[in-house]
UniProtKB/Swiss-Prot annotation:
It catalyses: a pseudouridine in rRNA + S-adenosyl-L-methionine = an N(1)-methylpseudouridine in rRNA + S-adenosyl-L-homocysteine + H(+). Homodimer. Keywords: Methyltransferase, Nucleus, Ribosome biogenesis, RNA-binding, rRNA processing, rRNA-binding, S-adenosyl-L-methionine, Transferase. It comes from Candida glabrata (strain ATCC 2001 / BCRC 20586 / JCM 3761 / NBRC 0622 / NRRL Y-65 / CBS 138) (Yeast). InterPro entries: Alpha/beta_knot_MTases, Rbsml_bgen_MeTrfase_EMG1/NEP1, tRNA_m1G_MTases_N. This is Ribosomal RNA small subunit methyltransferase NEP1.
């Protein structure tokens, strides 16, 4: 792994700081397609629909399932948001294989998919990515399930469903209670992926949304509800 493929800790917005007196937004990217493949020449790569169509067909897999780029897009959207820079966002990734990954709010995810893929291969192999500046800081790490053990006891848990009542995210978000939104990080599928966790299902648009846009709308809603500029 070349050095510039590694995640780096952020600058002044290093947000391992938890603002306990303020509500927080938690986002869980569910059904994330993060799976490694080792070729005959012993090279390991992140399985994806662009580079491994033939391999996926041989496996009898739906090519549309191998979309790690969706997780990449969501992470860039979430970590660039003002609510993350304010220290009030925590992101988790739950893969299709039920691997739970904790994302440090200060991590700088590589902008290119190629470098992101290399980072994910390293993470899934080593189970942790540490800061280059401080070996005690985990930027990405695999943690034990279930994700609910990392949420506040009074945290409202919600997922998005096109069939549910449409409302603006800021209407759902209160001014004092933390909320965890479960977002499907897949190209298509049913909205039942988080039924075991959630209290509510809502729709936030009259139109189908990509996972990245759904993340963006919820972040903007929280920023409006909690006066984050």
């Amino acid at each position: 792994m070349v050095e510039d493929s590694k995640a780096r800790i952020g600058g002044p917005n290093n947000s391992s700081v938890t603002k306990k007196q303020e509500p927080r937004l938690y986002v869980v990217l569910c059904e994330a397609s993060l799976e490694t493949y080792t070729s005959n020449d012993h090279r390991t790569s992140l399985l994806n629909c662009d580079d491994h169509q033939g391999i996926l067909r041989k496996m009898g897999r739906d090519i549309a399932e191998a979309r790690p780029d969706i997780t990449h897009q969501c992470l860039l959207t979430l970590l660039d948001s003002p609510i993350n820079k304010a220290g009030l966002l925590q992101v988790y990734i739950l893969t299709k294989k039920n691997v739970l990954i904790e994302v440090n709010p200060s991590v700088r995810i590589p902008r290119t998919f190629k470098r992101f893929s290399g980072l994910m291969v390293q993470l899934l192999h080593k189970l942790s990515i540490r800061s280059m500046e401080s070996s005690n800081t985990h930027l990405l790490r695999v943690v034990k399930n279930p994700v609910t053990k990392y949420l506040p006891a009074d945290c409202r848990k919600v997922t998005l469903s096109f069939d549910a009542e449409v409302m603006r995210p800021q209407e759902y978000l209160g001014d004092k209670q933390s909320v965890c939104v479960f977002v499907g990080a897949m190209a298509r599928g049913h909205d039942s992926f988080a039924d075991e966790y959630v209290d509510d299902k809502i729709a936030i648009s009259n139109y189908p949304l990509s996972a990245s846009v759904a993340c963006s709308k919820f972040c903007h809603g929280a920023e409006d509800a909690w006066a984050i500029i």
